[in-house]
């Protein structure tokens, strides 16, 4: 019995880069696609939002002097590159998918239509959301929160390379304190870097829980959905 039926997974673009630091690492892509295939086979309805940092990092120096709005549009396009790569990886594993973008790209993706996205999920397709919210000044964390609320997801899973939320960066501080559970309010008060404040506020106002967990540990995603206490739960 699944604890969560419909979830949205948020991955950073950097997660796809792996140790390379930029671009798309084929092994990381395959690993994440396999994790999603496993939870899909359990009967979960899965939506996905991916950042674009792995693609955008290569042009970030040039973008530093650009108009913010133009730079943000470049970032949105970077998320679509990752989304197409992920769609291909999933479909090679026999997982049916649909790609929806917040900016019209009719030759390669559907426009985001809420009711259609929900129908795809009900039919067992993994829905990948690209191009963020379609608006500048909003991060892909905020896009993930917004889409999760719109599709009536029961949970956002933020996949990272650490085991959850700590009081400081565990990769820099070996004495960092791990939080198995923490409230939205404490995340905001302690300025913990779970998601950006707009995303956290959206989740808090709509009582949407977040789990932050290590996506690089095989099987974590499936165990979480089956009821194990994995990572950090951010709750009301």
Curated annotation (Swiss-Prot):
* An annotated GO BP: UDP biosynthetic process
Activity: how regulated: Allosterically activated by GTP. Inhibited by UTP.
Q: What is its EC number?
A: 2.7.4.22
Binding of ATP, residues: 10-13, 53, 57, 160, 166, 169
CDD domains linked: AAK_UMPK-PyrH-Ec
Q: Kindly state one GO CC term assigned in the UniProt record.
A: cytoplasm
Pfam families assigned: AA_kinase
GO terms of molecular function: ATP binding; UMP kinase activity
Name of the top EC class for this enzyme: transferase
Q: What is its main location?
A: cytoplasm
Protein task: Catalyzes the reversible phosphorylation of UMP to UDP.
What PANTHER family would the database entry show? URIDYLATE KINASE, URIDYLATE KINASE PUMPKIN, CHLOROPLASTIC
UniProt record similarity statement: Belongs to the UMP kinase family.
Q: What is this protein called?
A: Uridylate kinase
Organism of derivation: Chlorobium phaeobacteroides (strain DSM 266 / SMG 266 / 2430)
